[in-house]
Each structure stands twice: as structure tokens, then as C-alpha cells.
Design a protein with these regions (language model features):
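Short beta-loop-alpha junction of Rossmann-like oxidoreductase domains
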Residues: 31-43, 96
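C-terminal helical subdomain
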Residues: 23, 27, 45-80, 85-89, ...
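Alpha-helical segment proximal to the catalytic Tyr-Lys
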Residues: 15-19, 78
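A short, polar/charged loop-to-alpha-helix boundary motif
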Residues: 95-107
Length: 121
């Protein structure tokens, strides 16, 4: 998984560059966000809507993510390093809920092929 690799690299570089150059290295896991790159992903609008409804604070916008990144450059976070920081309105910590179950009950028929198998991607 590419994200796991990126997080591992950040931890390794965070240790090396932290010790040798006092540099902090972190990753940020953002809410689903509408971007040019993401516009070609099938079902992105539904993923965005699902995450927005499931997140206690809703999805974070691209501008809010930019603000969060700016905060990470401040001296107020000078001891934060080698971390994957979630900026997703709480979505990553939400388990199954009544709201999620109601969403799943609606079915995935539009994401199935002619044999009834779910199409991933």
C-alpha cells in the first residue's frame, strides 16, 4: 500500500533528519477532497459524500488542509515529528454506526458487474 510506504519513509527520514539536522518529517491524512487528480476516480462524489456524512465534523476542505499544513510549520509544533496526522473531521476514528449501516443497506448494485461481483476502482 502506497500510503503505508509513505508513512514508513516519513518515520525513517524523521529519525535520520531529526537527529542529524533537527528537521521534522510528518505525513497528513486528509479527508476525501475534490481535486483535479481525483476527478477521474469513479465514485469519488459518493466517497466524498459518505465521508462527509460519517465524519463528526464533516470533511475538511482543501483550504482547511492548507491551513493545517501552515500550522505544522509553526514553532507551536516544533516537537511533532515522525507522525501521520489525521485531518479528516474524525472520519478515521469512526467505527460502524447506525448512519453507516443505513448507508450500506441501500446497496452496492451500481458497483457490481454482470456476474454480481463488486467492481473495485
Amino acid at each position: 500500500d502506497a500510503k503505508a510506504l509513505l508513512e514508513s519513509i516519513a518515520r525513517s527520514f524523521g529519525y535520520i533528519y531529526g537527529r542529524e539536522h533537527n528537521v521534522r518529517v510528518n505525513t497528513i491524512s486528509q479527508s476525501p477532497t475534490f481535486t483535479t487528480a481525483g476527478s477521474g476516480v469513479k465514485g469519488m462524489d459518493k466517497l466524498y459524500d459518505f465521508a462527509n456524512r460519517m465524519s463528526p465534523l464533516g470533511n475538511a476542505s482543501a483550504d482547511e488542509c492548507a491551513d493545517y499544513c501552515i500550522v505544522m510549520f509553526s514553532d507551536l509544533t516544533r516537537k511533532v515529528t515522525m507522525q501521520n496526522l489525521f485531518h479528516d473531521g474524525g472520519f478515521s476514528s469512526v467505527g460502524m454506526s447506525l448512519r453507516a449501516m443505513a448507508t450500506y443497506e441501500k446497496g452496492l448494485d451500481e458497483y457490481k458487474d454482470e456476474n454480481g461481483n463488486i467492481i473495485y476502482g
